[in-house]
Amino acid sequence: MKVLIIGSGAREHAMAWAVARSSKVSTVFVAPGNGGTATMGGKVRNTPVKATDIDALLELVAKESIGLTVVGPEQPLEAGIVNRFREAGFKVVGPTAEAAQLETSKVFAKEFMKRHGIPTAGYEVFRDYASAKAFLETCPTFPQVIKASGLCAGKGVVVAMSRDEALEAIHEFFESRIFGDAADEVVIEAFLSGQEASVFALTDGQNYQLFLSAQDHKRIGEGDTGKNTGGMGAYAPAPLVTPEVMRRVEEEVIRPTLAGMRADGYAYTGFLYVGLMIDKGVPSVVEYNARLGDPETQVVLPMLKSDLFDALLASVEGGLEVVPFEMQEGAAATVVMASAGYPDAYETGKVITIDPTVNDMEGVLVFHAGTRRDGDALVTSGGRVLSVTACAGSLKEALDRVYRAVDAIEFEGAYCRRDIGAKAL
């Protein structure tokens, strides 16, 4: 079968790599893909169609007789790509625009959790500056967490440690409009203490299969300092998510979420990412995402021993509960190599040199994000450039392998965090 992966990041490179391993897959199209998917060869090829150009994607699927489409990023989900593909009779992995509101509207998600008794922080919703300001001026405790309701590429959250910081944040959201329409509604919620981890499921709306848990590193600086990013590294499994914690997550979060979505008339299909805060073994939901995370995908997919394609197809056709879904023993880690200046302004077009020894390093995979081909050269084209992954028998060994590979890759101004996974060692 021919498969289409929509997106251009390291997440989509990892998906293309995983799907191409299946003997049942003949060709993997990546739209638009990146410099890494362009040079994978074998079954994988890029096609120059934007991830948000739904009409052109529908044309591509019809023309190439593509049997299954997998949506990587959130923007096409919000735009209703799954609805359009289903109306046209095409098989697609992902939630409808209505179901994807679990990610695309923080207000929808919080109200959904409250309605269905899913553990999450207490919250208030505001639709204008004056009411949010009045609330914060009388708010007795800080920190408070301030979130733009809409999509902000993972950057629309401020943990305000003081009243002044909180007031500044809502001014930026409502008055300076730094996130535009995405901050027309703002959620202010209680700060949850604990450690964050993520759990990922693939679901047909009723049945589900679980990937390994993971922890990512959102901040740009070591020691989790500085600005939020799309994610600077990750590892799996997360030691924090013990079998007992995972049992609670299934019982208190995943099953009630799927049942609640069915009850509300928005059966949820595709990937479900649950961002959790875990405090003394008790999980609370920080956020939902309607797709796999980036960089977490780059650690959870390499740890999947079974055929990903079989599971993806079953999530659309049925039979997901009986599909093999086995994980490897050991651990995986990924480190993001970013452009100088990221997450603020950065330059692109820097030549990337990957030492040939990297190809022979045991357990190492280099997934591309902000890269493109420029003639024979590979050059940078984004803030997050590469996601260097390694699998091994232990997290320590995986991290050793990753950093060995990172040290064999060069581009001007390359930056990475050197403490990925340190708190789990």
Curated annotation (Swiss-Prot):
<dbReference type="InterPro" id="IPR000115">
    <property type="entry name" value="PRibGlycinamide_synth"/>
</dbReference>
<dbReference type="InterPro" id="IPR020561">
    <property type="entry name" value="PRibGlycinamid_synth_ATP-grasp"/>
</dbReference>
<keyword id="KW-0658">Purine biosynthesis</keyword>
<dbReference type="GO" id="GO:0009113">
    <property type="term" value="P:purine nucleobase biosynthetic process"/>
</dbReference>
<comment type="similarity">
    <text>Belongs to the GARS family.</text>
</comment>
<keyword id="KW-0547">Nucleotide-binding</keyword>
<dbReference type="GO" id="GO:0004637">
    <property type="term" value="F:phosphoribosylamine-glycine ligase activity"/>
</dbReference>
<dbReference type="InterPro" id="IPR013815">
    <property type="entry name" value="ATP_grasp_subdomain_1"/>
</dbReference>
<dbReference type="GO" id="GO:0005524">
    <property type="term" value="F:ATP binding"/>
</dbReference>
<comment type="pathway">
    <text>Purine metabolism; IMP biosynthesis via de novo pathway; N(1)-(5-phospho-D-ribosyl)glycinamide from 5-phospho-alpha-D-ribose 1-diphosphate: step 2/2.</text>
</comment>
<dbReference type="InterPro" id="IPR037123">
    <property type="entry name" value="PRibGlycinamide_synth_C_sf"/>
</dbReference>
<dbReference type="Pfam" id="PF02843">
    <property type="entry name" value="GARS_C"/>
</dbReference>
<feature type="binding site">
    <location>
        <position position="287"/>
    </location>
    <ligand>
        <name>Mg(2+)</name>
    </ligand>
</feature>
<dbReference type="InterPro" id="IPR020560">
    <property type="entry name" value="PRibGlycinamide_synth_C-dom"/>
</dbReference>
<dbReference type="GO" id="GO:0046872">
    <property type="term" value="F:metal ion binding"/>
</dbReference>
<keyword id="KW-0464">Manganese</keyword>
<feature type="binding site">
    <location>
        <begin position="137"/>
        <end position="198"/>
    </location>
    <ligand>
        <name>ATP</name>
    </ligand>
</feature>
<dbReference type="InterPro" id="IPR020559">
    <property type="entry name" value="PRibGlycinamide_synth_CS"/>
</dbReference>
<feature type="binding site">
    <location>
        <position position="289"/>
    </location>
    <ligand>
        <name>Mg(2+)</name>
    </ligand>
</feature>
<keyword id="KW-0067">ATP-binding</keyword>
<feature type="domain" description="ATP-grasp">
    <location>
        <begin position="110"/>
        <end position="317"/>
    </location>
</feature>
<dbReference type="InterPro" id="IPR020562">
    <property type="entry name" value="PRibGlycinamide_synth_N"/>
</dbReference>
<keyword id="KW-0436">Ligase</keyword>
<dbReference type="Pfam" id="PF01071">
    <property type="entry name" value="GARS_A"/>
</dbReference>
<dbReference type="GO" id="GO:0006189">
    <property type="term" value="P:'de novo' IMP biosynthetic process"/>
</dbReference>
<dbReference type="InterPro" id="IPR011054">
    <property type="entry name" value="Rudment_hybrid_motif"/>
</dbReference>
<protein>
    <recommendedName>
        <fullName>Phosphoribosylamine--glycine ligase</fullName>
        <ecNumber>6.3.4.13</ecNumber>
    </recommendedName>
</protein>
<dbReference type="InterPro" id="IPR016185">
    <property type="entry name" value="PreATP-grasp_dom_sf"/>
</dbReference>
<keyword id="KW-0460">Magnesium</keyword>
<keyword id="KW-0479">Metal-binding</keyword>
<dbReference type="Pfam" id="PF02844">
    <property type="entry name" value="GARS_N"/>
</dbReference>
<dbReference type="InterPro" id="IPR011761">
    <property type="entry name" value="ATP-grasp"/>
</dbReference>
